């Protein structure tokens, strides 16, 4: 069942439900790996270079996957990126930061991976208003990334 996490997004409900079914079959570690892949995809899509806070979050997530970092470190990294999002005036970059907050927080709670996916759709809605084809393309990419793990 489609659990709407982010309000006010124009989504492809069928593809979102498919993504959620795949999500439910995956481990917490797999979803951390997915979040990192999704974040890289979003940075490529928006031609964004990772700032120090995002790089730190990626390092912590990689260490968490190796059992060398605690989820509290990931949560602290997410809070740093949240501050960037809160102060960002450019609507595209604000969404990129919101996605990265969720990517950074995924070692803390698995569901943050799904929230990052929904924020990515909100980003697509901002970049391509009223464009169902771009939304579907993004959901298909998310499904592909998630299935790869």
Label every model-predicted segment.
Residues 1-139, 147-149:
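Structured binding/interaction patches within domain cores
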């Amino acid at each position: 069942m489609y659990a709407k996490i982010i309000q006010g997004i124009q989504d492809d409900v069928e593809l979102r439900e498919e993504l959620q079914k795949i999500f439910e079959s995956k481990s917490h570690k797999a979803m951390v790996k997915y979040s990192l892949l999704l974040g890289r995809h979003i940075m490529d899509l928006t031609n964004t270079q990772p700032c120090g806070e995002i790089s730190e979050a990626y390092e912590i997530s990689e260490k968490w996957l190796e059992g060398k970092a605690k989820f509290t470190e990931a949560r602290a990294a997410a809070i740093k990126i949240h501050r960037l999002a809160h102060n960002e005036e450019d609507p595209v970059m604000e969404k990129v930061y919101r996605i990265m907050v969720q990517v950074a927080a995924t070692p803390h709670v698995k569901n943050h991976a799904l929230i990052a996916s929904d924020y990515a759709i909100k980003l697509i809605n901002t970049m391509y208003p009223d464009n169902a084809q771009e939304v579907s393309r993004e959901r298909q990419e998310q499904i592909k990334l998630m299935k790869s793990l």
